[in-house]
Amino acid sequence: MAKTTKYSGSQTEKNLEAAFAGESQARNKYTYFASVAKKQGFEQIADLFLKTADNEKEHAKMWFKELNGIGDTAENLLAAAEGENYEWTDMYEDFAKTAEEEGFTELAHKFRLVAAIEKHHEERYRALLRNVETAEVFKRSEIKVWECRNCGHIVVGKEAPEVCPVCNHPQSYFEIHAVNY
């Protein structure tokens, strides 16, 4: 963790980091397990895996907060971009080299493919951060098509309305309409 906390440099800090990692991993495993249970016709078991996964998510959040891991949106976007940068520039490349050295060429290739995805994630977070920092999330210098994420109302203009005229949801529900079909 990059931020300084009252735990910085202590064994307790290491324990908090381990608790966060463990709870985060457990959450993911339980969602994967729920999917298998559901496919095999065990709805109750799937539901219990998901409920437990939600509990684990909250436990992880509690420990992450102790580590000052959650900031405002701009801080979170920067932290996310930096994390993605580390993943694609260092982590996955190192993993790929090790896999190649050990003869796992297919896995090395997969590590590099995922690294390319992580690069895209970094670019996306940095673009969103620029929008937040320049107050261009809901306002642009050129005409855009804005869509309400709640009801689908379309507005054409340089900025999203303060309130959706159809469903009365706030501006925060608007995004630039994406046509990908």
How should these model regions be labeled?
Residues 1-181:
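Non-heme di-metal
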